[in-house]
């Protein structure tokens, strides 16, 4: 979350809500009944943690409201009734969800105006394009989204329930095979950190395995114990391209290719040459080169393929939103409070597409 026109978000925190497992355990500590984001993360040992967003879709609106409240009042320290709000949504977000979102913004937070944009479209804008295909992969879900002249092509969007959380689980399993045990939620966070700091995508996994001893890295756990991580460094993200490792079907390159093949033959060339990676799970070093190699194998041989993996791709959805909402031409696009009062939540389908 942050402000239009800024080049990076002001607040970055996990979309989680925690409630104390046992009332009164923290007597005298001014215990709250709900913790959000980093506060919940750091106390997860004594909390029951909930994820209101599952596979990119909001499934618990009460918790989501708490997250927005925390964003406005604690993180950004703004009064929501004084600022128009641009929100982002997953591709294929159900219509009822968009309406509920609109209703909460206008009725609970009294915003003066709002707009809802598809995440992948904003990532494409952030890369300076209006046509291309975006592979957006976060913690809970991945999507391939072809976009033509600023419009997502719904018939060709594919969703893959393989993302950051699955890779963290897989790395936990690989490390357990090495004899290291990570079971509690706090230890899971350690694995996530190992993933972020040490994992990378190999261009050719067979070749990488021959270099093994040199690729070992050590990682110090919070208790001072040092563990060694070797082939796990590239075997973990390999699951993105080869989900058979997780007992799943096709990988991200095949999904991207299938998504392009669902599009009109005349625009495929533009999609192949404008393939944009976005989201935290696309941050592994080497992922751009590997994607280039995999797509080249799948595509017609004459096709020019360009994979774009910009350094700020973790926040490219947010950056695209910052760009869009600062444009003078965008100012007429907002849904105003008056329009909402007149037409109700369904106005979102007329104005945001």
Curated annotation (Swiss-Prot):
Q: Which superkingdom heads the taxonomic lineage of this protein's source?
A: Eukaryota
Database matches in PROSITE patterns: ACTINS_1, ACTINS_2, ACTINS_ACT_LIKE
Which residues constitute the signal peptide according to the record? Answer: none
What are the entry keywords? ATP-binding, Cytoplasm, Cytoskeleton, Hydrolase, Nucleotide-binding
Q: Has the keyword ATP-binding been applied to this entry?
A: yes
Chief localisation class: cytoplasm
Coiled-coil segments, which residues? Answer: none
Please give the Pfam families that the UniProt record associates with this protein: Actin
Query: Which cellular component terms (GO) are annotated to the entry?
Result: cytoplasm; cytoskeleton
Q: Which reaction does it catalyse?
A: ATP + H2O = ADP + phosphate + H(+)
Localisation: Cytoplasm, Cytoskeleton
InterPro entries the UniProt entry points to: Actin, Actin/actin-like_CS, Actin_CS, ATPase_NBD
Family statement drawn from the similarity comment of this UniProt entry: Belongs to the actin family.
Role played? Actins are highly conserved proteins that are involved in various types of cell motility and are ubiquitously expressed in all eukaryotic cells.
According to UniProt, the name of this protein is Actin
Source organism (scientific name): Acetabularia peniculus
What is this organism's lineage?
Eukaryota, Viridiplantae, Chlorophyta, Ulvophyceae, TCBD clade
